[in-house]
């Protein structure tokens, strides 16, 4: 078992594809599709790595990440951010919010897998 | 030689797909089941009549069995693999496309779709930041594209995928593509409604070109004694933007002056005698050759059945007027071929150049060009004149000794002449054979 990934994303078929890829590579994948209580879900699950979409219903991925980074228990959690906007402004915002890595949609499956592996040192 | 050795696999694939038993196919093709088994496992070569018989029983073209999927499909699959960066077995792409033609085609279609969508998404990213409705639609499209892209990549990967998952992914792609179609349709409707005005017909120069082309470069309103630019403006400039109306009015005013100086009934007789030769006509009419060139471009078909082409550029080389000929196309945007006599005329203002020209890839006698640069506007005191060049292109006249035509092109991007000192950018065409 490579570890637990928590995927917070609201697009069901993206969830399905990422879940398939990561599960096949040996990861235990949990998913969540709502921004409002996302931070609580992260705390409850305490995953090894978090994949976080920026545009979530209810609450933005940036806000969720800022809240987590303020919590000492999650200050070092590896976070891969997904966004549908590639502008440097978004990358900057993600970095400032504390993302470990930033990925633009549409992404290559292999890149997601590589990023997850690299961020967890697996 | 995968192409050669896979015929058996394709026979088996096809047979299983249409639910024919091996023994039945063997019997109907007049061979033993064990021999067919060897063929299907690519251990015996097959060709000739037996191949035709088996193809007939399986109801496919024999080439589908021998050659498998088309070269275009294979090429697309290769590109897909290289773009998506997976670990696809490129050496077995033939086999994949041959054995799963439906899946292979689906994959190719998905890629085509992804490419198109990615392109439109790229084009629109700029607007994304400014328009909330656009931002929402584009986010939706990107999400859907991402889902399709990921799912298609999984299907494209080598190795077994559980059939249940395969079905599920197939269904997801189907759903997402339907959603994508819906979103893009909505987006197009929105954008069309949004861009109803200024951006519709491109630059003012393009609007002018379109308006003049629509009237055949001939304006009857200006050919009569009391002809008025206003009447012509009303007909031609109705739908034009304000800037284009300005350009059009300038052009029509010049047309009116040319028509007053060289009315049709005056031009008719020397034209019958000399043809559209601007030098001879300028002599016969005692007129400015530049004006004669412009006038020739405006003549109606009953006076000049074979039309002439005309290009006018300003001192920067920018085309300000273009009337192309079928044998002498002119670029709609950007710079024209630097070899055009039009530009050489700017090197030697006041000298009338007259020479045959030939576009690449065209045979026959070619065309004849006259080019002349003259000052535009009034002569300024102690200041440089602003030159303008004109080039008339006309059918090759009958001359006793034809010089070698000067090779010219349309524009570098669409020109096959590789060894050209004037080339400014690479050609998108393959080099001329």
Where are these regions (language model features)?
Chain A
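Conserved acidic carboxylate
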Residues: 9
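The feature encodes the CheY-like receiver
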Residues: 15, 57, 75, 87
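Charged docking surfaces used in two-component/phosphorelay signaling
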Residues: 16-24
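Short hydrophobic/Thr-rich beta-strand motif most characteristic of the beta2 strand and flanking loop
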Residues: 26-33, 41
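Active-site beta3 strand of CheY-like receiver
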Residues: 45-51, 56
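C-terminal output helix
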Residues: 107-117
């Amino acid at each position: 078992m490579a570890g637990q990934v928590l995927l917070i994303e609201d697009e069901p078929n993206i969830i399905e594809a990422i879940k398939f890829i990561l599960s096949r590579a040996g990861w235990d994948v949990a998913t969540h599709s709502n921004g409002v209580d996302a931070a609580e879900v992260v705390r409850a699950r305490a995953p090894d790595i978090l994949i976080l979409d920026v545009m979530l219903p209810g609450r933005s991925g940036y806000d969720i990440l800022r809240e987590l980074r303020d919590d000492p228990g999650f200050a070092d959690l590896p976070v891969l951010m997904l966004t549908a906007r590639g502008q440097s402004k978004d990358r900057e915002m993600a970095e400032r919010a504390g993302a470990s890595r930033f990925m633009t949609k549409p992404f290559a499956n292999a890149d997601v897998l590589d990023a997850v592996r690299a961020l967890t040192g697996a | 030689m995968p192409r050669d050795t896979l015929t058996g696999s394709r026979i088996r694939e096809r047979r299983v797909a249409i639910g024919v038993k091996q023994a039945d196919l063997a019997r109907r093709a007049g061979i033993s089941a064990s021999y067919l088994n060897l063929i299907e496992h690519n251990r015996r070569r097959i060709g000739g009549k037996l191949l035709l018989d088996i193809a007939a029983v399986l109801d496919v073209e024999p080439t589908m069995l021998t050659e498998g999927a088309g070269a275009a499909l294979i090429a697309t699959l290769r590109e897909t693999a290289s773009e998506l960066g997976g670990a696809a077995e490129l050496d077995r792409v033939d086999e994949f496309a041959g054995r799963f033609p439906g899946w292979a085609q689906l994959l190719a279609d998905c890629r085509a779709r992804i490419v198109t969508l990615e392109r439109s998404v790229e084009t629109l990213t700029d607007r994304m930041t400014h328009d909330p409705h656009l931002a929402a639609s584009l986010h939706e499209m990107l999400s859907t594209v991402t889902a399709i892209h990921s799912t298609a990549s999984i299907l494209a990967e080598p190795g077994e995928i559980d059939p249940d998952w395969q079905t599920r992914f197939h269904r997801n792609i189907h759903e997402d593509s339907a959603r994508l179609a819906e979103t893009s349709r909505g987006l197009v409707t929105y954008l069309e409604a949004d861009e109803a005005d200024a951006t519709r017909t491109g630059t003012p120069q393009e609007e002018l070109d379109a308006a003049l082309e629509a009237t055949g470069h001939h304006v009857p309103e200006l050919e009569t004694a009391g002809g008025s630019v206003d009447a012509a403006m009303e007909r031609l400039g109705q739908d034009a933007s304000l800037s284009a109306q300005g350009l059009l009015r300038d052009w029509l005013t010049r047309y009116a002056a040319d028509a007053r100086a060289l009315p049709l009934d005056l031009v008719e007789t020397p034209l019958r005698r000399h043809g559209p030769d601007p030098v001879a006509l300028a002599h016969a009419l005692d007129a400015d050759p530049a004006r004669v060139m412009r006038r020739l471009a405006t003549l109606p078909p009953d006076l000049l059945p074979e039309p002439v082409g005309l290009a006018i550029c300003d001192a920067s080389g920018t085309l300000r007027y273009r009337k192309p000929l079928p044998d002498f196309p002119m670029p709609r945007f950007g710079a024209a071929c630097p070899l055009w006599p039009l530009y050489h005329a700017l090197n030697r203002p006041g000298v009338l150049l007259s020479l045959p020209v030939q576009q690449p890839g065209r045979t026959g006698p070619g065309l004849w060009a006259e080019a002349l640069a003259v000052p535009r506007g009034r002569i300024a005191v102690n200041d440089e004149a602003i030159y303008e060049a004109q080039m008339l292109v006309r059918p090759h006249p009958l001359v006793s000794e034809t010089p070698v035509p000067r090779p010219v092109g349309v524009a570098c991007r669409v020109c096959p002449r590789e060894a050209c000192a004037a080339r400014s950018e690479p050609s998108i065409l393959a080099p001329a054979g």
